[in-house]
């Protein structure tokens, strides 16, 4: 019980010896040992004291009233308890009022600097929590800063964490002056702001001595001084000013001395007294540090344009706060910049006297470090006298053999090893390289020091390994050729510009399939869960027995799922940039839908004159895929975040399987591609879990087999060959029906229907004859094993139609419309006449087999004009020109990647043009198309609009990229020639995969851009003109060394 409460008790219930202590100390004049009531106990104001006094009066009973002792005690206790509770309630109410008043006072103070808002005449304040205002948000976006809330900015600028603030302790707003400081931090334009404190404001909970509540009322009265009548008013003012100025000057001198003690750089920096020339005082002040008054060493400039030594200003900022020591303008370490180069040149050209005793040499300030290090070396040499026990003169360390160097440095090596084990965990290499780096810096050999530092940090002084790998791949260098170039460049320049082969192999591992972990949900059926699978044999997993068909082939492939994973990881940046471009959050995990175009094509003769191994067919088949687009399902909408810009480029057509086999060999083709197709079918019903951008994301795949020519479509879909009566792979029309009805057909065939028809063909459930059964199944004669999309391959359509026009030209020259019964010799003569004329007029060289380039040049108005010179009839001229004109209007519709954007008018006119084209064929060229029509003419006239309406394009889904890949295959095979064809195929597959890597393409494009802009390696430092002329990175051919 407190003293106050004990004194307030009535006499009946007070302690019997309560008065004794007071009587005792009065008697002996001894001061009582009771503590004085604290400030908290004195917080009760006068109103409370009056209330307490009144309650005391009510509690005390009059002596005249007679009450029994027991009743008197009970009554006194009840009244005392009731009044005590009332007193406590009043105290609590007062505490609540005090806290409310405290919070109201806090609302008038700045959270950061503690200044009252009343000092600002505009009463401008800003909330501590919540998003920033529009002006600040615009500034942050302009400076590309990520922070968008006040707590982040306050923590960054003032190093104050306001996230844990309590409203009863901390103010909730800050002043406009602090707001200006934040703006100045993120803008380059200086503004006059002043931060009134050197340290952050510390806020305490409310108490009796609360500074927030009592500061305004606690004023210090000025001592009243009698007026001095002896002096006049002016004399008094002058004296006061002199006293103030003297105080300020003394304070400035004191501050400078404190700052000099903080920096303590007199042993490191050069004094201005060492200047060899008697420069003007103002000039000396401009080249000296404002803190230590020495010559500027590693000078830096503040925002307020004062100059300091870097170490001096950083030391002062660390101790005294973020202000300029000269003008106390806010200054942060990040604001320090190097002065202009012309000023540095002036500083380096100053002549100074060497401070070393017995050395009066005058040297330039810029070369003082090297001069001083020479003194230090001489001093060290004087202290160290090498022991030479006679014999031949002592040789320099670098001229010794490696064994002799080890012997001489044996003691030093032992000491370095002991230091490394004691201090650096045994890392001797790091200690030695750091010693070497410091030695280079001390000798001002900064160029070599930068190269060594780059090597220590893993960057290397030359090109990045990925750049070297991109150069090797894009210049078609084999490993041995690259290694020869690497050794030649290193020997000629003396530097390691290119990286060694082992660094390139490390870089390419991350780009090849089988490197990145992934998972399928549910797991793929009949596919291993092992993700570290690289190049595998195309025949692996194929059960063979003695009775099986013998397979004479060499096949190498990637597993389909690992190849897709590697392709997606290679496109990681494109995926994230696409999400950013569509304003999607980068943490969305999908599901992503990936649309894949599949291509397969056979190559002709790929024979080589070298290599050992089994006698395999000298024909090849390539299976490849292209990631066409990636979309994400977000808010019930499918948003496309990636779309291949050049879907027919060989740079995006990734190889999946290479085999030396004939595409006409159905058994071999089925044996090799069946495992691959099984993986494809398994992936259709599963989802891929792959980490993209550090977040696990979900991918689904849609496979579209569109990059097949007609021959291969018929092979894999089980249809009869191209000369069949059933001429179309999209509909069931026969050749006669197609010639009679040239335009009006629709797509009816599908992979599922072909499988059903094969079962009918195999089982013949209706016991029909061969002709009846063939008519029922519409030309299906084998089991389909690859699902293709019923479509037109634009490239082969172009080639097929050009071949047909080539024949029409010959027939028009021979006037077959008059004489249909021409002999074979006459037809051969027409062809020779046409070839000779095209060579002369169009520079078209005759070809045994028409290529895409020949078809493009042939199908032009100029060619028709040239051919018409060989035709006599003007009417035939008009018919032929109109036919070519209609074809050239129809061609862009199926050749363009997006006809709705690239040629919308021709797309609208396609139906009319195709009908007019069909009318010309059936009238003017009836001699050729009566009762028959070519396969591609039928597809061109009948199915193009329907396919475009379904897919949006025909050209984008063509096999042109795969055809370009065929050319690359031949080139890679010549380049990677090895003794074994097995390893040769692996090299070709690996090299071709890396050639299609978007990651390497970015490096190569950046490298070419730098070279084209003139940022090539300096001749004195790198390649330049010192390279032999036969080594050129711009060459497209293999380098012969």
Curated annotation (Swiss-Prot):
It is found in: Nucleus. GO terms for cellular component: DNA recombinase complex; endodeoxyribonuclease complex; nucleus. A divalent metal cation binds at residues 601, 709, 963. It holds the Pfam family zf-RAG1. Zn(2+) 1 binds at residues 265, 269, 292, 294. CDD domains: RING-HC_RAG1. Zn(2+) 2 binds at residues 289, 292, 309, 312. Its main location: nucleus. A zinc finger (RING-type) spans 289-328. One of its GO terms (molecular function) is sequence-specific DNA binding. A zinc finger (RAG1-type) spans 350-379. The record marks 894 as: Essential for DNA hairpin formation, participates in base-stacking interactions near the cleavage site. One of its GO terms (biological process) is V(D)J recombination. Keywords: Chromatin regulator, DNA recombination, DNA-binding, Endonuclease, Hydrolase, Metal-binding, Multifunctional enzyme, Nuclease, Nucleus, Transferase, Ubl conjugation pathway, Zinc, Zinc-finger. InterPro entries: RAG1, RAG1_imp-bd, RAG1_Znf, RAG_nonamer-bd_dom, Znf_C2H2_sf, Znf_C3HC4_RING-type, Znf_RING, Znf_RING/FYVE/PHD. It catalyses: S-ubiquitinyl-[E2 ubiquitin-conjugating enzyme]-L-cysteine + [acceptor protein]-L-lysine = [E2 ubiquitin-conjugating enzyme]-L-cysteine + N(6)-ubiquitinyl-[acceptor protein]-L-lysine. Zn(2+) 4 binds at residues 354, 359, 371, 375. Residues 390-457 bind DNA. Zn(2+) 3 binds at residues 304, 306, 324, 327. It comes from the Eukaryota. Its EC number is 3.1.-.-, 2.3.2.27. Its cofactor is Mg(2+); Mn(2+). The RING-type zinc finger mediates the E3 ubiquitin-protein ligase activity. The NBD (nonamer binding) DNA-binding domain mediates the specific binding to the nonamer RSS motif by forming a tightly interwoven homodimer that binds and synapses 2 nonamer elements, with each NBD making contact with both DNA molecules. Each RSS is composed of well-conserved heptamer (consensus 5'-CACAGTG-3') and nonamer (consensus 5'-ACAAAAACC-3') sequences separated by a spacer of either 12 bp or 23 bp. Homodimer. Component of the RAG complex composed of core components RAG1 and RAG2. Belongs to the RAG1 family. This is V(D)J recombination-activating protein 1.
């Amino acid at each position: 019980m407190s003293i106050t409460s004990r004194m307030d008790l009535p006499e009946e219930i007070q302690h019997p010896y309560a008065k004794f202590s007071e009587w005792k100390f009065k008697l002996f004049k001894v001061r009582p040992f009771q503590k004085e009531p604290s400030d908290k106990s004195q917080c009760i104001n006068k109103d409370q004291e009056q209330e307490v006094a009144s309650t005391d009066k009510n509690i005390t009973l009059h002596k005249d009233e007679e009450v029994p002792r027991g009743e008197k005690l009970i009554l006194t206790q009840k009244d005392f308890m009731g009044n005590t509770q009332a007193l406590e309630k009043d105290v609590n109410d007062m505490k609540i009022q005090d806290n409310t008043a405290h919070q109201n006072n806090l609302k008038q103070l700045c959270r950061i600097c503690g200044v009252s808002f009343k000092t600002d005449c505009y009463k401008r304040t800003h909330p501590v929590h919540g998003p920033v205002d529009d002006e600040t948000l615009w500034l942050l976006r302009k400076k590309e800063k990520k922070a968008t809330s006040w707590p982040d900015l306050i923590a960054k600028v003032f190093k104050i964490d306001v996230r844990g603030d309590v409203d009863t302790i901390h103010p909730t707003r800050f002043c406009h002056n602090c707001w200006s400081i934040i703006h100045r931090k993120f803008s380059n334009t200086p503004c006059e702001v002043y931060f009134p404190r050197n340290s952050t404001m510390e806020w305490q909970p409310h108490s009796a001595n609360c500074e927030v509540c009592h500061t305004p009322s606690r004023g210090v009265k000025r001592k009243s001084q009698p007026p001095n009548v002896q002096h006049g008013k002016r004399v008094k003012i002058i004296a006061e000013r002199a006293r103030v100025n003297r105080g300020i000057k003394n304070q400035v001198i004191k501050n400078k001395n404190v700052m000099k003690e903080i920096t303590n750089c007199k042993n490191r920096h050069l004094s201005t007294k060492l200047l060899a020339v008697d420069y003007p005082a103002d000039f000396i002040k401009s080249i000296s540090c404002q803190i230590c008054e020495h010559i500027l060493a590693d000078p830096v400039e503040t925002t307020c344009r004062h100059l300091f030594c870097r170490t001096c200003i950083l030391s002062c900022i660390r101790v005294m706060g973020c202000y300029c020591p000269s003008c106390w303008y806010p200054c942060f370490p990040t604001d320090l910049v190097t002065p202009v180069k012309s000023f540095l040149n002036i500083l380096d050209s100053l002549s100074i006297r060497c401070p070393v005793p017995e050395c009066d040499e005058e040297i330039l300030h810029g070369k003082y470090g090297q001069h001083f290090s020479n003194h230090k070396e001489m001093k060290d040499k004087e202290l160290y006298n090498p022991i030479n026990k006679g014999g031949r003169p002592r040789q320099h360390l670098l001229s010794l053999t490696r064994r002799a160097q080890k012997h001489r440095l044996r003691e030093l090596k032992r000491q370095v090893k002991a230091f490394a084990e004691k201090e650096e965990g045994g890392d001797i290499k790091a200690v030695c390289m750091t010693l070497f780096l410091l030695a280079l810096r001390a000798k001002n050999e900064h160029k070599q020091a930068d190269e060594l530092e780059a090597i220590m940090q893993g960057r290397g002084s030359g090109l990045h390994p990925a750049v070297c790998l991109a150069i090797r791949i894009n210049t078609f260098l084999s490993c041995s050729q690259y290694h020869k170039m690497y050794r030649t460049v290193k020997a000629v320049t003396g530097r390691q510009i290119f990286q060694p082969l082992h660094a390139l192999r490390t870089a390419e591992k991350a780009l090849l399939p089988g490197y990145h972990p992934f998972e399928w949900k549910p797991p793929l059926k009949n596919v291993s869960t092992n993700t570290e699978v690289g190049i595998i044999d195309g025949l692996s997993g194929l059960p063979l027995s003695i009775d099986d068909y013998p397979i004479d082939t060499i096949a190498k492939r990637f597993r389909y799922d690992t190849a897709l994973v590697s392709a997606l990881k290679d496109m990681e940046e494109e995926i994230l940039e696409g999400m950013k471009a569509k304003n999607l959050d980068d943490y969305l995990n999908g599901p992503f839908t990936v649309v894949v175009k599949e291509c397969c094509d056979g190559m002709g003769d790929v024979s080589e004159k070298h290599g050992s191994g089994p006698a395999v067919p000298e024909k090849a088949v390539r299976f490849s895929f292209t990631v066409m687009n990636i979309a994400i399902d977000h808010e019930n909408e499918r948003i496309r975040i990636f779309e291949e810009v050049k879907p027919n480029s060989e740079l995006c057509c990734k190889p999946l399987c290479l085999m030396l086999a004939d595409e006409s060999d159905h058994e071999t083709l089925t044996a090799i591609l069946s495992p691959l197709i099984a993986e494809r079918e398994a992936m259709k019903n599963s989802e891929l879990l792959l980490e993209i951008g550090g977040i696990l994301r979900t991918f689904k795949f849609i496979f579209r087999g569109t990059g097949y020519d007609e021959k291969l479509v018929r092979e894999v879909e089980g249809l009869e060959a191209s000369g069949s009566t059933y001429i179309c792979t999209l509909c069931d029309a026969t050749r006669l029906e197609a010639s009679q009805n040239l335009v009006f057909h629709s797509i009816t065939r599908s992979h599922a229907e072909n499988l059903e028809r094969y079962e009918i063909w195999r089982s013949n459930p209706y016991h029909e004859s061969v002709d009846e059964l063939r008519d029922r199944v519409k030309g299906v004669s084998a089991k389909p094993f690859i699902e293709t999309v019923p479509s037109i391959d634009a490239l082969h359509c172009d080639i097929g139609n050009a071949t047909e026009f080539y024949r029409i030209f010959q027939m028009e020259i021979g006037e077959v419309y008059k004489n249909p019964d021409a002999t074979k010799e006459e037809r051969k003569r027409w062809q020779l006449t046409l070839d000779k004329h095209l060579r002369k007029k169009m520079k078209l060289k005759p070809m045994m087999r028409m290529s895409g380039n020949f078809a493009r040049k042939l199908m032009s108005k100029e060619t028709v004009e040239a051919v018409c010179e060989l035709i006599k009839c003007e009417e035939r001229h008009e018919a032929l020109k109109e036919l070519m004109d209609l074809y050239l209007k129809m061609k862009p519709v199926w050749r363009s990647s997006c006809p709705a954007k690239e040629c919308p008018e021709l797309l609208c006119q396609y139906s009319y043009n195709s009908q007019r084209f069909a009318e010309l064929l059936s009238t003017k060229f009836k001699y050729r198309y009566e009762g028959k029509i070519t396969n591609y003419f039928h597809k061109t006239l009948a199915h193009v609009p329907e396919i475009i309406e379904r897919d949006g394009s025909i050209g984008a889904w063509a096999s042109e990229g795969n055809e370009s890949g065929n050319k690359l295959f031949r080139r890679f095979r010549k380049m990677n020639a090895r003794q074994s064809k097995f390893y040769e195929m692996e090299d070709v597959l690996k090299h071709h995969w890396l050639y299609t890597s978007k990651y390497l393409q970015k490096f190569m494009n950046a490298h070419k851009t730098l070279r084209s802009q003139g940022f090539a390696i300096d001749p004195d430092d790198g390649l330049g003109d010192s390279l032999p002329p036969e080594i050129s990175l711009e060459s497209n051919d293999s380098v012969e060394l």
